[in-house]
C-alpha cells in the first residue's frame, strides 16, 4: 500500500484516470456494518449503503428516510456531499458524525458545527466519516411510501444501467437535465459513454467506456 492511499466507501461517483493513478485504493465497504435504533436517534456505520439503511428503517417502521432508497453509495458519502432526492436532503436530519482525521485521531462533529447547502458541505475531505447519528422523525409511517418513491425512480431514471447517478448539479430555479435536453444533447455519445435517453443528467457506460470518453462527453 502506498504512503498516501485513497480511502473510499462504495466507489460510487468516482472516475479514475487510470494511466496516471499510482496511489493505493482502500475501500471501506467490507468493514463491520451496523445500524442501531434508540428512543431518539438512528446510529449507523458510515459504510452502510443508503438503500440498505432506508430499507432497514422502513422494515422497522421508522419514517422520514424513504428518500434515501436508491441513492447510490454509502450514508457517509451521502452526508459528505449532502445528497438528496424528492425535495429532501440528508444533512438537516444529521445529529452528529464521528470521523477520523488524516493523523488517525477520532473526533465528533455536531450538526451546528457544520455548514451545508445544495449538494455540498464543509466537512473536511481528508477525514473519514466512520459513523452517522440521525434524528428519528415524528411523521406518520407510510407503508407504501418507499415502494412509491422507488417506482418513481424506475420510471424517470435509468437505475438498471451503469452510471454514476446524476452528473451535474441543478442550477438555481432550473434543472440540468432540461438544459441538456434543450441543447439537443440527449443520446450523445463518446466511445462507450452516452447521455441517457431516459434522463439526460445520467451518463451511461455501455461496458466499454473509459474516463477519456467521460471527459469528452
Protein language model features and the residues they cover:
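A generic local secondary-structure boundary/capping motif
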Residues: 14, 54-57, 65-69, 82-89, ...
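Anion-binding (especially nucleotide phosphate/pyrophosphate-binding) glycine-rich loop
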Residues: 1-75
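Structural signature of FAD isoalloxazine-binding scaffolds in flavoprotein oxidoreductases
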Residues: 15-33, 80-110, 124-131
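Short, basic and Ser/Thr-rich N-terminal targeting/leader segments
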Residues: 8-10, 93, 161-162
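Short clusters of hydrophobic/aromatic residues that line enzyme substrate/ligand-binding pockets
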Residues: 34-35, 65, 79-81, 116-118, ...
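Phosphate/pyrophosphate- and phosphate-bearing ligand-binding catalytic cores of soluble enzymes
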Residues: 14, 100-102, 106-216
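Gly/Ser/Thr-rich helix-start
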Residues: 10-12, 48, 71-78, 85, ...
Amino acid at each position: 500500500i502506498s504512503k498516501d492511499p485513497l480511502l473510499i466507501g462504495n466507489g460510487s461517483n468516482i472516475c479514475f484516470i487510470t494511466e496516471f493513478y499510482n496511489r493505493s485504493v482502500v475501500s471501506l465497504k467490507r468493514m463491520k456494518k451496523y445500524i442501531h435504533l434508540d428512543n431518539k436517534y438512528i446510529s449507523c456505520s458510515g459504510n452502510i449503503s443508503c438503500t440498505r439503511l432506508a430499507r432497514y428503517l422502513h422494515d422497522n417502521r421508522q419514517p422520514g428516510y424513504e428518500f434515501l432508497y436508491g441513492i447510490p453509495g454509502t450514508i457517509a458519502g451521502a452526508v459528505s456531499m449532502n445528497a438528496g432526492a424528492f425535495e429532501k436532503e440528508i444533512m438537516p436530519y444529521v445529529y452528529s458524525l464521528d470521523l477520523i482525521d488524516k493523523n488517525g485521531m477520532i473526533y465528533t462533529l455536531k450538526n451546528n458545527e457544520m455548514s451545508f447547502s445544495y449538494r455540498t458541505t464543509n466537512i473536511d475531505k481528508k477525514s473519514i466519516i466512520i459513523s452517522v447519528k440521525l434524528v428519528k422523525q415524528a411523521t406518520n409511517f407510510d407503508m407504501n411510501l418507499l415502494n412509491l418513491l422507488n417506482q418513481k425512480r424506475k420510471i424517470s431514471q435509468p437505475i438498471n444501467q451503469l452510471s454514476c447517478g446524476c452528473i451535474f448539479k441543478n442550477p438555481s430555479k432550473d434543472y440540468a437535465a432540461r438544459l441538456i435536453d434543450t441543447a439537443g444533447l440527449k443520446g450523445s455519445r463518446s466511445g462507450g459513454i452516452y447521455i441517457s435517453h431516459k434522463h439526460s443528467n445520467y451518463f451511461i457506460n455501455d461496458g466499454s467506456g473509459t474516463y477519456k470518453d467521460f471527459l469528452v462527453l
